[in-house]
């Protein structure tokens, strides 16, 4: 039978009663209170073997109390509960030394299991990594059960250097997760360097990763530092790792095994100190079976697998995401918008094949092009419905139709401001909204062949590569 004394702090009497009963049945001695002052008095007196506390209490926030608890009794495990189920809540709990974070409502069996695990572990002093208190610019948004699991996993990973493999469809936010792991982790003071394998010509990937020496190949007129060198002391994010050529996979495996690499054309091994985070929208196990991905490299990268759910699997997060993106647009100078409940319901029912990125692009269009303050279901329906394809001649109907559509949007947009002018920066906002679908369509039409896409668009290949990177366009190579 488990033994131990547990201190419970929550201003909700019903929660205190439920926890008291469940923990007592599990064999623990329980003392409960409804405020932080009483909890602190008990802790400072040396009472309790474990603390379970809510974040928001009448007299003090648990995040302000936690550092004092950890300073006075560094061996005392603290489990934090919160109904504020955001990414930053999980991160702040981890930063302030909490043993575990549990979003409300939680499963009592899971809580009992966590309590048992915490009390069974050998006592050790926790090292605090106190972060800032700001809640602005939350990198990940959503309160669904799926996102809560991701937040908790990320919080556990922050103070480690473990290699992480992020899997998820295009547009689910894989780079956002990688950046969060870096920005709130132990390497936050080092560089974060991202490289998208699908956006770089295959014959240049090794040079991009490892750098090259002057004269190592035609056109190498100077020495060039690779991404490993640029990321030294920080994090290297290998996006779309499934598109990495086999030769580069072999070199990457050697780096992971030996902790050193050589530049293209170089002979002297260079020690490396980077954290690797990889991401893919492909099934790497299938690629392994097809002989397109090294199994040994997969196991080196897949130390901690993390799956990001598509937006259709967490539709309850759509309202929070919509509010978040409208606030971002408002900070950029666009008019404030609201979405009525029926329109939100329509957005929640949509399948979102482009996931969060598609939703963000939609919200930006709504903010930039519609004068109405309240976004209605009819507006949403018009945006989500796809027009039937039509056969257009080469002489101009395409341009005429597109031009008429843009003109119609802009006329409505300007009329919404009456005699006033829209916020500055309209040209670049409209250009970005047009560029993204244009470049995506060209890449899709050329099956991801950037040379052909650049020719089709009339762009220099390097210009196209820069735009792909700046617009965060996912390039998927397919064979005919």
Swiss-Prot record:
Native species: Azorhizobium caulinodans (strain ATCC 43989 / DSM 5975 / JCM 20966 / LMG 6465 / NBRC 14845 / NCIMB 13405 / ORS 571)
SMART domains per the UniProt record, alphabetical: AAA, REC
DNA-binding region(s) in UniProt: 450-469
Start and end residues of each Sigma-54 factor interaction domain: 140-368
PTM description: Phosphorylated and dephosphorylated by NtrB.
Matching PROSITE patterns: RESPONSE_REGULATORY, SIGMA54_INTERACT_1, SIGMA54_INTERACT_2, SIGMA54_INTERACT_3, SIGMA54_INTERACT_4
Stated role: Member of the two-component regulatory system NtrB/NtrC, which controls expression of the nitrogen-regulated (ntr) genes in response to nitrogen limitation. Phosphorylated NtrC binds directly to DNA and stimulates the formation of open promoter-sigma54-RNA polymerase complexes.
Keyword Nuclease found: no
Gene: ntrC
Main location: cytoplasm
Stretches that traverse the bilayer: none
GO CC terms of this entry: cytoplasm
Subcellular location per the Swiss-Prot or TrEMBL entry: Cytoplasm
Name under which the protein is recorded: DNA-binding transcriptional regulator NtrC
GO BP terms: nitrogen fixation; regulation of DNA-templated transcription; regulation of nitrogen utilization
A GO molecular-function descriptor: phosphorelay response regulator activity
């Amino acid at each position: 039978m488990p033994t131990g004394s547990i201190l419970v702090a929550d201003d909700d009497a019903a929660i205190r009663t439920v926890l008291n009963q469940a923990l007592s049945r599990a064999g623990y001695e329980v003392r409960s209170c409804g405020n932080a002052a009483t909890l602190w008095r008990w802790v400072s007196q040396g009472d309790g073997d474990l603390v379970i506390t809510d974040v928001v209490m009448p007299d003090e926030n648990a995040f302000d109390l936690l550092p004092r608890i950890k300073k006075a009794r560094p061996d005392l495990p603290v489990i934090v509960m919160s109904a504020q189920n955001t990414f930053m809540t999980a991160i702040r709990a981890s930063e302030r030394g909490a043993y575990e974070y549990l979003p409300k409502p939680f499963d009592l069996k899971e809580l009992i299991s966590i309590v048992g695990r915490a009390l069974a572990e050998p006592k050790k002093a926790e090292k605090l990594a106190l972060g800032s208190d700001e809640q602005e610019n939350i990198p990940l948004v959503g309160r669904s059960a799926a996102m809560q699991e991701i937040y908790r996993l990320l919080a556990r990973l922050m103070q480690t250097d473990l290699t992480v493999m992020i899997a998820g469809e295009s547009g689910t936010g894989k780079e956002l997760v990688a950046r969060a792991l870096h920005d709130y982790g132990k390497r936050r003071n080092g560089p974060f360097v991202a490289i998208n394998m699908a956006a770089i010509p295959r014959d240049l990937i090794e040079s991009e990763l490892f750098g090259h020496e002057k004269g190592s190949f035609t056109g190498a007129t100077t020495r060039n530092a690779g991404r490993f060198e640029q990321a030294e002391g920080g994090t290297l994010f290998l996006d779309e790792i499934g598109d990495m050529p086999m030769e580069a996979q072999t070199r990457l495996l050697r780096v992971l095994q030996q902790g050193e690499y050589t530049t293209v054309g170089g002979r002297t091994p260079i020690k490396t100190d980077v954290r690797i985070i990889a991401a893919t929208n492909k099934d790497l196990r299938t690629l392994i079976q097809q002989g397109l991905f090294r199994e040994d490299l997969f196991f080196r990268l897949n130390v901690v697998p993390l799956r990001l759910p598509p937006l259709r699997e967490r539709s309850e997060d759509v309202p929070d995401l919509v509010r978040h993106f409208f606030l971002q647009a408002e900070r950029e100078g666009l008019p404030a918008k609201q979405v009525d409940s029926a329109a939100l319901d329509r957005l929640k029912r949509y399948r979102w094949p482009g996931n969060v990125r598609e939703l963000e692009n939609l919200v930006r269009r709504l903010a930039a092009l519609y004068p109405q303050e309240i976004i209605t279901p009819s507006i949403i329906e018009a945006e989500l419905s796809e027009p039937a394809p039509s056969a257009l001649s080469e002489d101009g109907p395409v341009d005429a139709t597109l031009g008429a559509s843009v003109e119609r949007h802009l006329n409505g947009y300007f009329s919404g401001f009456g005699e006033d002018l829209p916020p500055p920066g309209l040209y670049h906002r409209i250009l970005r909204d047009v560029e993204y679908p244009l470049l995506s369509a060209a890449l899709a039409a050329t099956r991801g062949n950037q040379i052909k896409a650049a020719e089709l668009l009339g762009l220099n290949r390097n210009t196209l590569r820069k735009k792909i990177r700046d617009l965060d366009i996912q390039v998927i190579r397919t064979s005919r």
